[in-house]
């Protein structure tokens, strides 16, 4: 009886301590509400959809990542931002929301900017995203 009770509690403790892990692909997501884990399940665009990417400095001297989507992905960006007017979208990198800008107008040019309101190392993020971007385009070129 004692052994089965102890075994039961050990199993119960193990089950309670396991956390649900869900990996998100690096990219842009819809913010679906203001609650925890309020992102769409899949990104509407990923880092593989970037055409160009640059690390720049904004007017306040802060690092920002600027980029342009591939020409055939720009309509998706335009529609996603049109759908999100008055709402937020989020850029996720390594399962972390890096920025979640409020959309005021449709962004029709296919350009975007990733700012750094939470103090993340944008230079490191830029290098990692650039590497992913280059690898995606190398694969595409060799097919």
Regions found by a protein language model. Give the residues of each.
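Positively charged n-region of N-terminal signal peptides that target proteins for export
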Residues: 1-5
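C-terminal motif of bacterial Sec signal peptides marking the signal peptidase cleavage site
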Residues: 14-15
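Extracytoplasmic
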Residues: 19-109
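Structured soluble/peripheral alpha/beta segments that form catalytic or ligand/cofactor-binding pockets
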Residues: 101, 105-130
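Conserved small/polar residues in nucleotide/adenosyl-binding loops
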Residues: 132-139
């Amino acid at each position: 009886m004692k052994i089965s009770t102890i075994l039961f509690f050990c199993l119960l403790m193990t089950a309670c301590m396991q956390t649900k892990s869900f990996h998100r692909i690096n990219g842009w997501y819809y913010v679906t509400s203001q609650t925890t884990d309020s992102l769409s399940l899949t990104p509407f665009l990923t880092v593989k959809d970037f055409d160009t990417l640059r690390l720049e400095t904004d007017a306040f001297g802060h690092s920002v990542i600027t980029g342009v989507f591939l020409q055939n992905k720009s309509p998706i960006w335009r529609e996603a931002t049109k759908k999100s007017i008055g709402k937020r979208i989020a850029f996720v990198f390594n399962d972390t929301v890096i920025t979640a800008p409020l959309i005021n107008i449709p962004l029709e040019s296919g350009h975007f900017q990733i700012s750094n309101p939470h103090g993340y190392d944008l230079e490191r993020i830029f290098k990692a995203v650039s590497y992913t971007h280059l690898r995606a385009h190398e694969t595409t070129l060799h097919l």
